[in-house]
From Swiss-Prot:
One of the components of the core complex of photosystem II (PSII). It binds chlorophyll and helps catalyze the primary light-induced photochemical processes of PSII. PSII is a light-driven water:plastoquinone oxidoreductase, using light energy to abstract electrons from H(2)O, generating O(2) and a proton gradient subsequently used for ATP formation. It is found in: Plastid, Chloroplast thylakoid membrane. GO terms for biological process: photosynthetic electron transport in photosystem II. PSII is composed of 1 copy each of membrane proteins PsbA, PsbB, PsbC, PsbD, PsbE, PsbF, PsbH, PsbI, PsbJ, PsbK, PsbL, PsbM, PsbT, PsbX, PsbY, PsbZ, Psb30/Ycf12, at least 3 peripheral proteins of the oxygen-evolving complex and a large number of cofactors. It forms dimeric complexes. The gene is psbB. The keyword Transmembrane applies. Binds multiple chlorophylls. PSII binds additional chlorophylls, carotenoids and specific lipids. This is Photosystem II CP47 reaction center protein. Its main location: plastid. GO terms for cellular component: chloroplast thylakoid membrane; photosystem II.
Length: 508
């Protein structure tokens, strides 16, 4: 036929069985990729330290999605929360991966079968004997089945009626585990951070889908609407399907980047806004203040801060710090976190406590400034020492650590103080191992960043695809050069441009 590469899909335009075949093959490829990717990730994943080396630091992409749906055990004998298990059951990480690969193989065989046996009675119109599809009826069937799946997920899987539940955690990502969730039917169900909304919205949307599917199965569209929306044209289906996909992609890009109950920070890492707003820093100070109010010493109060909470308050875990095109996991950027050194408290000669101004998200370098009270600069690490007034040496800054590995240790040596002041710009200070993965200090993004970038990019691309195919199906007659009100007999093939006698073909 000599079709250009961008038009090869026209071969299934009027061939319903082979249209079905290529869609089954697409499902085979998607399921096969998911299963294979899961097995690859399981081969390289280190589950030994869920606090300082969680899945999102290691660049895992499909494991977080499996985990949020209730998979926590491995046939390797480990649990995602760090424990060991003896009976992981069938639906472990490996079991789910294997099921996807088996399903992929079955879809592959089904696709071949439907490609070979394309001339089936079911695809023939009884009146004309030609292949045709009743698209409004197929729409009703798909809507009904997707409604059943949606309702079933919300009513059974999420609630635990028949299923494990989903991953639920506290606002600071410390106590996450898989648990059952009751539907939330009040206005709080619209809060994107309330897990109960996941159950209730799936139940409601599924019910609506079932009812809408039954409606479209039992009621035929009016002729004027059928013709106006080109409901008999398969390209209309393509256009509206692309619309559904790009809309969903935009939504999930938002819920991933800004955070929601469906994207827990324990599985995908913190959001950039939690760094920008000092979210974890405020919680840490609140806990320390509460400890001091209970007559604990400063050292005791800081020692009770969970290492997990302190680790979130580190700029290296900010997904916006990694470049979009820097390959590799976060561990490949700054190294594998080994331990929290503790919270550094800086003081000048007068004993005033100084605070290091933290680096904003979109800076790679930032002046090291130590402030007192309401932002009064008391010390810095100057760019030009000849003009300095507030250098660590001149001001006489010391640093003392509370909590962590250096609890109770203090330094007055200016070089050491400056080293820790520079590191305090990046949040809480951690010992990192750059040698194991040959990490060279350039931050990487987390799976949260990759997912957002990928889905936002493809959503934009698919938006233009929707416009393109929607225009083609609505204005098909215009693009083909046929006037819809044309009364004259048109001889196809007589003219280079249809119906234009000035472009009469020359006989060869």
């Amino acid at each position: 036929m000599g079709l250009p590469w961008y038009r090869v899909h026209t071969v299934v335009l009027n061939d319903p069985a082979r249209l079905l075949s290529v869609h089954i093959m697409h499902t085979a490829l998607v399921a096969g990729w998911a299963g294979s990717m899961a097995l690859y990730e399981l081969a390289v994943f280190d589950p030994s330290d869920p606090v300082l080396d969680p899945m999102w630091r290691q660049g895992m992409f499909v494991i977080p999605f499996m985990t949020r749906l209730g998979i926590t055990n491995s046939w390797g004998g480990w649990n995602i929360t760090g424990g060991t298990i003896t009976n992981p059951g069938l639906w472990s990480y490996e079991g789910v991966a294997g099921a996807h690969i088996v399903f992929s193989g079955l879809c592959f065989l089904a696709a071949i079968w439907h490609w070979v046996y394309w001339d089936l009675e079911i695809f023939c119109d009884e009146r004309t004997g030609k292949p045709s599809l009743d698209l409004p009826k197929i729409f009703g069937i798909h809507l009904f089945l997707s409604g059943v799946a949606c309702f079933g997920f919300g009513a059974f899987h999420v609630t635990g009626l028949y299923g494990p539940g989903i991953w639920v955690s506290d606002p600071y990502g410390l106590t996450g585990k898989v648990q059952t969730v009751n539907p939330t039917w009040g206005v709080e169900g619209f809060d994107p951070f309330v897990p109960g909304g996941i159950a209730s919205h799936h139940i409601a949307a599924g019910t609506l889908g079932i009812l809408a599917g039954l409606f479209h199965l039992s009621v035929r569209p009016p002729q004027r609407l059928y013709k106006g929306l080109r409901m008999g044209n398969i390209e209309t289906v393509l256009s509206s399907s692309i619309a559904a996909v790009f809309f969903a992609a935009f939504v999930v890009a938002g819920t991933m980047w800004y955070g929601s109950a469906t994207t827990p920070i324990e599985l995908f890492g913190p959001t950039r806004y939690q760094w920008d707003q000092g979210y974890f820093q405020q919680e840490i100070y609140r806990r320390v203040s509460a400890g001091l109010a209970e007559n604990q010493s400063v050292s005791e109060a800081w020692s009770k801060i969970p290492e997990k909470l302190a680790f979130y308050d580190y700029i290296g875990n900010n997904p916006a710090k990694g470049g979009l095109f820097r390959a590799g996991s976060m561990d490949n950027g700054d190294g594998i976190a080994v331990g929290w050194l503790g919270h550094p408290v800086f003081r000048n000669k007068e004993g005033r406590e100084l605070f290091v101004r933290r680096m904003p998200t979109f800076f790679d370098t930032f002046p090291v400034v130590l402030v007192y009270g309401f932002g009064i600069v008391r010390a810095d690490v100057p760019f030009r020492r000849a003009e300095s007034k507030y250098s660590v040496e001149q001001v006489g800054v010391t640093v003392e650590f509370y909590g962590g590995e250096l609890n109770g240790v203090s330094y007055s040596d200016p070089a050491t103080v400056k080293k820790y002041a520079i590191r305090a710009q990046l949040g809480e200070i951690f010992e990192l191992d750059p040698a194991t993965l040959k990490s060279y200090g350039v931050f990487r993004s987390s799976p949260r960043g990759w997912f957002t970038f990928g889905h936002a990019s493809f959503a934009l691309l698919f938006f233009f695809g929707h416009i393109w195919h929607g225009s083609r199906t609505l204005f098909r007659d215009v693009f083909a050069g046929i006037d819809p009100d044309l009364d004259a007999q048109v001889e196809f093939g007589a003219f280079q441009k249809l119906g234009d006698p000035t472009t009469k073909r020359q006989a060869v």
